[in-house]
Amino acid sequence: MFPPSSDLTELNDGQPLSGHHADKPEEACGVFGIYAPEEAVAKLTYFGLYALQHRGQESAGIATFAGTTVHCHKDMGLVSQVFQESKLNEMVGTLAVGHTRYSTTGSSHRVNAQPAVLPTRLGPLALAHNGNLVNTNQLREALAERGCEDFVTTTDSEMIAVAIANEVDKGKDWVEGTIAALTLCAGAYSLVIGTPEGIIGVRDPHGIRPLVIGVLEEETPRYVLASETCALDIIGATYVRTVEAGELVHITESGLVSHRLAESADRKLCVFEMIYFSRPDSVVNDESLYTYRMRIGKHLAKESPVDADLVMGVPDSGIPAAIGFSQASGIPYAEGLIKNRYVGRTFIQPTQHMREHGIRMKLNPLKDVLAGKRIIIVDDSIVRGTTSRKIVRALREAGATEVHMRISSPPVTHPCFYGIDTDSQDQLIAARLTVAEIAEQIEVDSLAYLSQEGMLLCTGEDISHFCSACFNGRYPITVPDAVRRSKLMLENITA
């Protein structure tokens, strides 16, 4: 595909592992990059990815650069499963790029793990991508016309990397090549790209997926790029600012230089990052998302009050909103569900009795807290409703006399095509049923959702600055019909 021009050392091993779906929108991916000569960049990236583990649990990878030599290790599994200290010690360099993955385009297989590493005339590049393109068929055709047809993976991320490498091989530098390649790409992308020269961070013209800049305070600043500020905190970096929508930052030994993409548009940060995906200790718009989620809980209590004895949240994502609901309503807050944080994928089949009570592998109710009580249970979203029904049944079995559910987001009625894995529209319960019908199906005494107006009002920002297509179907980037049919949209054309 491209002439080899560097020493590419792949340190990969592992086997494919099937994906899975929960009764929630599945996380986006996490990206991390660091330029820090004389630092242990692989270890710092490991810890950064550890903080971003919630954004993707299927695979993890790190690529480090020592001049034109790149060491890349990636595999299926959690960050702690993929990397051992001995491996990290082998991965020396002045800069690193890392990724945690949940598949939104391309299936869950080892070959699709990132970073994607490619050779170019200027040396290798390693690309980590959070987001989803919506024009992969057109991009593939455009690359085929340039002679780029031998793809290794089934991901749109590799296609972006190929497009950049192609532009560089035609004579452009790293920044020019990246900007030119991205004119071919439509959709959501936050990219961190490692090169022998430095690291590049870039967000799509709408800024749908997040990307922030941090700095390690030394005599010479060492820059960090990450999906969320929590990844800066874990390595002791200081938050500087957000990479703006349509901005490219180039970090080298000379420092950080900002560039604009050829096309810019109104910023449209995914509002689900605020509600659910990003960690509550991450900062957006100068406040923690914990504070925002408490605020939407307070607003929810004002919009949809109900008389009850206790307010509780579904761990962990429903807790901040539940605390806010409690504060606004004056109804005491209590922990009524205990979460087993060590439940992961298992290949051991449960018994039929366990399947019937399957939620208790993850959440177990406190009977002495719930018995004889009227309960308000707060959660961040309902997608299919199956888990919600199991939780409600468990609460009733524990002695709750009434169960009222409050959801700190509007009904999810449309799938996401910009880097979050939601079900197709016919599988979304709120696209098929009214609120009253959903309440009956999940067996609650009452059900209410936060209004779209309330959700956006609580951001404190202009409502036009957020993508809320999953709630209203207004997609800021046109989604072709072919893309709407399947999240694994590259599988059929790369077999």
Curated annotation (Swiss-Prot):
Positions annotated to bind Mg(2+): 317, 379-380
Record key words, sorted: 4Fe-4S, Glutamine amidotransferase, Glycosyltransferase, Iron, Iron-sulfur, Magnesium, Metal-binding, Purine biosynthesis, Transferase
Pathway in which this enzyme or protein is active: Purine metabolism; IMP biosynthesis via de novo pathway; N(1)-(5-phospho-D-ribosyl)glycinamide from 5-phospho-alpha-D-ribose 1-diphosphate: step 1/2
Every Glutamine amidotransferase type-2 domain range: 29-254
The UniProt record lists the keyword Transferase: yes
Entry EC no(s): 2.4.2.14
Residues annotated as catalytic: 29 (nucleophile)
Source species: Synechocystis sp. (strain ATCC 27184 / PCC 6803 / Kazusa)
Cofactor binding remark: Binds 1 Mg(2+) ion per subunit. Binds 1 [4Fe-4S] cluster per subunit.
Name the record gives this protein: Amidophosphoribosyltransferase
Residue segments, region Disordered: 1-22
Described purpose of this protein according to its UniProt entry: Catalyzes the formation of phosphoribosylamine from phosphoribosylpyrophosphate (PRPP) and glutamine.
NCBIfam families in the record: purF
Source lineage: Bacteria, Bacillati, Cyanobacteriota, Cyanophyceae, Synechococcales
Propeptide positions: 1-28
PROSITE patterns: GATASE_TYPE_2, PUR_PYR_PR_TRANSFER
Cofactor: Mg(2+); [4Fe-4S] cluster
HAMAP family in the record: PurF
